[in-house]
Amino acid sequence: MNPVMKLPSVPVWSHWPTERLREEKETNPRSYSRGFEQRAFSDSERMFPSFPLCFTPGIVTGDIARRGWPTFAGVDLSGPKRRGNVIFVVAVDPLSQRRYPIEILRGDWKSPEVAAQLAGVNTRHPNLRIIMVENNGYQQALIDWIKQTPGENQYWFKVEAYTTGFETKVNPTYGLPGLEVEFKNKAWVVPSSEFEGHPPHCSCGWCVWVREVTDYPMGAEQDSVMAHQFAREAISKWGTGITVGVAQGGASLGTR
């Protein structure tokens, strides 16, 4: 037997005991192969091979945030079987319509903590228009609670529930495949200075997002990708329009 395929008799890291390794290999075989057998994903396996084209050094997110551009947030909430929440904040250049991620927050927060994090986002980004929050049933209680306590959550009127589904994810224009088109056309400006130089297993919001987008759909985690998509949906619905193209020379994007 190829020794690479064997599970170690003694786990190399207590965070991944033998039983967890076996479960990971059974439930996420491609992710296991990438993470524990060092078999890299090919471009044909990735949904977003053009993502690195958007990496732009020298962008200071604080400067972008202070420009007063329309800002949108997507929120992927934890569920009964999945811990962790992600808040993804994007500013949109009203002239070129290019999208600039300016803040990515991750945390294992309870409902009041999620609300507090959103309040902080609303305070830091006064031009925040919409907070698009995933709603698959379990999260509805949080959404209702935020809207029913406007005194405590003064951003309540900006919260909109978004229901995900397979058809939404695979739609070539509005779903995740459409995001690859936007990456290819450099409609997103990714501030690479936020994560370049970080250690390989850095768990900051930026590094986790870059890994998840790079490995999607084969990676074990996808929370940041979905929060990114919810922010994109907020832009499409309440922003300046849907991106349909951008010239290689940097011309303004069209809308429809």
Outline where the language-model segments fall.
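Gly/Thr-rich phosphate-binding beta-strand-loop-beta motif of the actin/hexokinase/Hsp70
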Residues: 65-92
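Short hydrophobic beta-strand segments
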Residues: 72-74, 187-190, 245
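ATPase catalytic-site recognition across NTP-hydrolyzing enzymes
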Residues: 4-75
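Mg2+-dependent endonuclease catalytic cores in nucleic-acid-processing enzymes, primarily RNase H-like
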Residues: 2-15, 43, 88-216
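Short coil/turn segments at secondary-structure boundaries
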Residues: 31-40, 46-53, 134, 191-196, ...
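Acidic two-metal-ion nuclease catalytic site recognized across multiple nuclease folds
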Residues: 104, 229-256
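Charged alpha-helix within mobile-element recombinases
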Residues: 212-235
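Short, flexible loop/turn elements at secondary-structure junctions
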Residues: 40, 77-79, 137
